[in-house]
Amino acid sequence: RSLLHRVDLTDLAFVTIDGEDARDFDDAVYCEETPEGWRLLVAIADVSHYVRPGTSLDRDAQKRATSVYFPSSVVPMLPEKLSNGLCSLNPGVDRLTLVCDALVNRKGETTAYQFYPAVIHSHGRLTYTAVWSALQGEAWGLNTVGPRLGELKRLYALYGVLRAARSERHALDFETEESAADFAADRSEE
């Protein structure tokens, strides 16, 4: 029943890209070049398959609205069995997702898109640091991303085109940095 009416995308090399300390992987990307530009697929974990509307699990998740991360612990929006297990797009396992499948031309314009339920198989858990290192040609990053380098270069090329199109539209750019607290062994702030 789980796979009924889902598109099988397990042959596409989706990857997750998150921070080093991420524990749940709720989105994955795949990009291929087309004659007109790129096909970009963004998959998010299909939590709705496991959390039915109106259930106590659903009500609790609505109250929490998000997971809250502390330096050495987390208060998850969903039980860990879901957030880090069944709904986490871990590498090497098939997972139920909702996918946005978009075509983007060389001017950075989205020419077509559709949403659909799918099954994906993550081919790698990557970090922002490793991806950037690989794109810079550094040995550590290249070793870490391995055979995914070509896909990452396509994603980065698409990013460049989208960034240029955004600039052309004079869109606002909000530069933000993720904040983090460092604590000493005795739990005092450093």
Describe each model-derived feature in a short phrase.
Residues R1-E189:
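Electropositive polyanion-binding surfaces
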